[in-house]
Amino acid sequence: MKAATRRIAVGVVATALIAELVGCSVLDAADNSAAAKQGAPGAKKGAPAPKSAVRLIGDGSTAFTGPQSGLLKPRRLKPGQQPPQFVVFSWDGAGEDSQKLFSHFRKVGKKYDATMTYFLSGVYLLPEEKANLYDPPQHSPGRSDIGFNDTQGIRDTVRQLRGAWQDGNEVGTHFNGHFCGNEGGVGQWSVDEWKSEISQARSFVKNWRTNAGLEGEQPLPFDYDKELIGARTPCLEGRTNFVRAAAELGFRYDTSGINDQIWPKKDLGLWDLSLQMVPVPGRAFETLSMDYNFMVNQSGTVKGDPSKFEYWGNQMRDGLVKAFDRAYNGNRAPLIIGNHFESWNGGTYMRAVEETIATVCVKRDVTCVSFRQLADWLDAQDPEVLRKLRTLPVGQAPRNGWAAFLATQPAGAPGSTKVKQAERH
């Protein structure tokens, strides 16, 4: 990938220390191949989706190929049932470059039966020579703080996106030029400017074959106008106006804010599935659940002291696992984790993420899903049940147990009919 050096502006959040922010009824246990997950209740993989005729869209960059396979069917919680533990692993600016991290983590996801969300930067499908097709809000045409791509980088990224979706993963957006700060950054954009940015992100996905001259490549197997339902803003800036724009455009969730580990709620009709404050082992403060934030609090640079690489990676892994444990053994709030395909500090954070996936996704009653699947499950629940779940503080299970806490028959729930709790289709 021929992108320029990625500049990630930072904001701040006060905990015990200032933590800098990155620029960036049940879906319960799936029928994993991992032996450690045996005993998870009721999850079965459905038969593969029937093959559908491919219907090209536009210039053939995308196509309708039928419903996405491999997704868990959401089921409403039964009275007194303990919620499953959801974990979402997500990636900002997803693209395949010489590091081959996109393809690597697709393999990791398959190994541990974890589907993820890949937030694509639209300019990664736009070649340098066509840069002027991008007209960013409050900047001149052809400007991008993360550069553009070359033909091989576009080809490689498209192939990974295609395979990722076919594996059951989600393709969201990280928008385009990644502008942060006070000089035309996304935090200064109006609702209409956000709509323009979203429209252009869609356009680059829907026209990469023409723009990159890759007519021989197979299309992306989805209609991006329907696939795109959520995003994370650059540097976690500009969320207020973005959510307003996204609500008008039919998005279903946003993950650009800062939350504690409690059950999510909606904001202007969108699920707020933001990153969360998690422990930093050995320190008296918490930081955001993202590789960049651990890096800032450890080395403050992407090229720190090599003698500390292993310790820093272990610290991030252990912090994420501690966050998982307090949810899993507590209020069961979904754990939201964000990352970048980067080799900061010798790649120690990529190791940390992989080891976290291997640790948590194989546990009983745990489902590692994309944001889309989490939103589907939340939408399937009784609103009163979700309201009760939101009363549980970080790490706190119901005092008298789940059976008593959620004993009330949810409105519209089936009577005594036994319902399968999760199915893959």
Language-model features: locations:
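Aromatic- and acid-rich polysaccharide-binding/catalytic face
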Residues: 169, 173-174, 273-276
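Active-site beta->alpha N-cap acidic-glycine motif
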Residues: 55-170, 177-181, 211-244, 260-261, ...
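Active-site cleft segment of glycoside hydrolase catalytic domains centered on the general acid/base Glu
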Residues: 182-200
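C-terminal region of N-terminal signal peptides and the immediate post-cleavage residues
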Residues: 20-43, 47
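Secretory targeting and sorting signals
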Residues: 1-30
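C-terminal domain-boundary segment and adjacent tail
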Residues: 61-66, 70-71, 253-265, 320-425
